[in-house]
Amino acid sequence: MRYLNNAKKSILLIFGNILIGISCYAQMGVLKGNIYLKQNGEPVAGAGIFPVNDKSLGVASDADGSYEINLPVGKQTIVYTLTGLKNDTLTLDIKDGTEAIRNIYLTSNLKNLNVVVVSASKYEQRIENITVSMEVISPKLIENRNTTNVTSVLEQTPGVTILDQEPQIRGGSGFSFGVGSRVATLIDGLPIMTGDAGRTEWQFIPVENIEQIEVIKGASSVLYGSSALSGTINFRTAYPKERYHTYLRTYGGVYDKPSNREAKWWDGPATFSGINFLHSEKINRWDLIIGGNGLYDHGFIGPPLAMSSLPFQDTTISNNDVASRWGRLNFNIRHRFKNIEGLSAGINGNFMQSHSNFSLVWANDSTGIYNAFPKTMTLTDSKAFYIDPYISLTGKKGSSHQLRSRIFYADNDNGNDQSNKTNVYLAEYRFNRELISLGRLNVTSGVYFQQSFSHASLYAGSGNDKNTLENYAAFIQLEKKLIKKLMVSAGFRAEYFEMNNKESQLEPILRAGLNYQLTEGTFIRCSYGQGYRYPTIAEKYIETGAGGISVFPNPEVQPESSWNAEAGIKQGFKIGNFFGFADIAVFEQRYHNTIEYIYALWQPDQLAGFKFVNTGNSRVKGLEVSIMGEGKPVRNFAISFLGGYTYTLPQSLEPDYIFATDNPPTDFLPDSLSYSSTSTDTSKNILKYRFQHIAKMDIELTWKFISFGYGVRYYSFMKNIDKKFYDLDETVLPTGVKAYREKNDKGTLVHDLRLGFKLSEIFKASFLVNNATNLEYSLRPLKIESPRNYTIQLTAAF
């Protein structure tokens, strides 16, 4: 109760600060226009526009070259910049409440695609200037792929794999059954993972209102805290442009029959359909956005299969029960005040109600591969929302203050004593300033707190169905150009955790990086960063069971940590009017006290089951190449491209280290548990649930009103999984997993196709085919992926 009161006081303090801010006023004006290439008049997309005395106000030009920037009143000098183009400056007087229109013509040297990001340092930077590896996904790709769940577009991103809803970046994590993500997931820079299990609810992400997705590869705990052990995915939501915008997308589709016709469990068509909408508008000094979506999905994984050979059956789930349904509504509201320069305040929100299923194990490897094994499917009815109050103040001398907060609530009704409710209260104060007197030293610092409260009998392993986890942190990051072309950055974070008022941990975290501009379009970088992850409530205290599979608590599990080092080079290029970046990086990640989900006989008077334990030290090293670009090489013809290849060598450094022993009945000798004894393939000591080779490409070709898109993904064979799944295959869990993996050991190649027609300035129609070859494939062992499916999509934007 003490923690709940503290959380309420903290939230009230945040709201109080916002109300104080609302009593003040600010003076702002607007500068807008278009940016063109002087040589041919083509619009320039992605150019950076910022005032020299406050880069944090910077914006980027849109695909048509248009831009709009809010500026404090008074005399302002504006810089227009794009790598490979000559910078231009403009000096003018900004007047309160007025609009100035200026068109700018930039001259070419070498022309490159420019992307403005914020995730790397928590302030806006051009992507070629950052010291870490990052991929940026545009809203155009999200729309073109008919994205209803962001995992489908993340799966197309180089270096990123979504393994049954769990994100992996460069092989930095395996599979942990939905608990304890090693990748931090953020919306507008704040975590959006559940407070009990550290899991991301992907359908909760507002896909209709994403400005861009930024993926940081490698440990990034200095800025984003626990869970950013191997990377970060940040979803940046958009705010209105000067002109109102309304967007509607509706779609319908059907799953094809599986290539193994005998595995089809449904009668009639297996359909899915949905609608997305968004309206954004500026009304005087108010910025307003409202959006949402609704979806129905029959699904391709059916209810548990009747199996007479088992001592238990599961006939309570029907075909209709497994269909997914959800509705979501979100809003962004911001007010820009009149009489105090740079002051704004607002509130964002997102509400969702859903019905979904989770299948842990398929029924068998042939006719039951699209059905669940008895007692291993969970139906969930969820209600969730978050509310984000915030206030921001940008000063005349380039300083900025931001106070952002989030109230996140999730209620999952799973039945079978597995239901859970969590409340998360979090807030971050962040200060940023460029210190001119210290040679333009950029300082980003702040404090952060998060309090998570869980109420669930699922976590009674603590001795109570109510559990709390608190996290407090302070951080600072410094960036400076030591010489004209060398950028140096360094950061520090102190993290404090407390679980149930019984145990606590204080941990320092460091990072550093260099970026050197070798030529006009060539940037060399290197970086080192530490990561740290405290165990979740679920990892310590979960206690449940299903289908002969039990899960045991482990209050003794310890935090895991990592460090990441990499060196890379980013090369801008131009081929005609096609602009792009090519990037190559080599990296190494080390993990200490790695947490894994291990199956054993943990208690002599109960069935065997899984438990989270620390398994020792491991290493992932590798190489990654990626290319992104877009442009118009000839008149009426446009190309956009995103592709890459990732090689990883994920290895256990202590394959014979005994991290635990089981606890058999009397008169039986305990088994020693190590990497070697719990793995199906110990050659080269490859870690479990990793792909060593991943290649991806997405290309969109547009000619006049017709567009064609092609996406392809390759995954090498997953060499190593938990050996116990093979052992159980011969006893209580006859799934055929061993035979399936022996038969399908050559890797997986998946193709997607799409065709679009721009019917008018408002309407566009598209036809999409995912898994075009109707390949039967599994990425996460014991879970089949979707058969071929067809979608018709209609969008309207005005």
Pin down the residues of each PLM region.
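Extracytoplasmic beta-strand/coil segments of soluble accessory domains associated
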Residues: M134, T151-L190, T194
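Structural signature of Gram-negative outer-membrane beta-barrels, strongest in the C-terminal barrel
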Residues: I391, R440-N442, S462-Q589, D698-E700
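Membrane-embedded beta-barrel scaffold of Gram-negative outer-membrane proteins
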Residues: Q402-N412, Q451, Q517, R525, ...
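Flexible loop and strand-edge segments within Gram-negative outer membrane beta-barrel domains
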Residues: D297-N330, R334-T394, S400-H401, F408-L426
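Gram-negative outer-membrane beta-barrel transporters
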Residues: R249, V586-R590, K611-K723
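N-terminal periplasmic accessory domains that precede
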Residues: A100-Y105, V150-V153, Q168-R170, V183-L186, ...
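Short, acidic, small-residue-rich periplasmic hinge/interaction motif at the N-terminus
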Residues: Y36-N40, A47-V52, T81-L85, K95, ...
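Short acidic/polar hinge/loop motifs at secondary-structure boundaries
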Residues: Y67-N70, L190-K217
